[in-house]
């Protein structure tokens, strides 16, 4: 692989061009990795600001008008409101689980039905979350589970 960087002070936006014989899985992974830098999210913890990638986030929760980001190892606070995260991360596999939470589908280990049409998610951290009946259908649809599968 050959990498060339051209610096141009008149450039307004970073542009990356890939020259290859054929677009294969390795190229697609590189593109996905590059795009993830554009979707970096900031969170604060102990007075420090951290850069978080969507793949590292298990879920985002709103508590007392504050927004918290949960990863496998830490909890961060972030200024955007929950609906802003939902809109921004929808293409990254995030979905609304309740009025107060947005979950990363990649962070879900398993799910099972619960009373009243709700779902219980087990996250990769072992933590359990409830998907309200209002949003359970959307989750099933994202997973390709139609009808009475669950």
Task: Describe each PLM feature range.
Residues 7-9, 22, 47, 82, ...:
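A broadly conserved detector of short glycine/acidic/proline-rich loop/turn motifs that flank catalytic sites
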Residues 26-124, 128-130, 150:
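Conserved binding/recognition cores within well-folded domains
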Residues 88, 138, 142:
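Solvent-exposed, charged/polar functional surfaces in cytosolic regulatory/catalytic domains
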Residues 20-22, 125, 133:
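Short, structured patches in soluble enzyme cores that scaffold and shape functional sites
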Residues 141-150:
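Short, charged, intrinsically disordered terminal tails
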Residues 1-26:
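N-terminal regulatory/sensing modules of transcriptional regulators
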């Amino acid at each position: 692989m050959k990498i060339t960087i051209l610096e141009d002070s008149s450039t307004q936006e970073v542009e990356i061009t890939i020259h290859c014989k054929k677009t294969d899985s390795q190229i697609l992974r590189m593109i996905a990795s590059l795009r993830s830098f554009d979707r970096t999210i900031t969170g604060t913890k102990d007075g420090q600001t951290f850069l978080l990638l969507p793949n590292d986030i298990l879920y985002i929760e709103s508590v007392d008008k504050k927004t918290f980001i949960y990863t496998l190892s830490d909890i961060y606070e972030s200024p955007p409101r929950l609906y802003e995260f939902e809109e921004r991360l929808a293409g990254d596999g995030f979905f609304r689980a309740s009025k107060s939470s947005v979950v990363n589908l990649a962070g879900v280990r398993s799910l099972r039905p619960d009373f009243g049409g709700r779902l219980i998610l087990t996250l990769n951290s072992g933590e359990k979350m409830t998907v309200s009946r209002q949003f359970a259908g959307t989750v099933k649809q994202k997973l390709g589970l139609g009808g009475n599968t669950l």
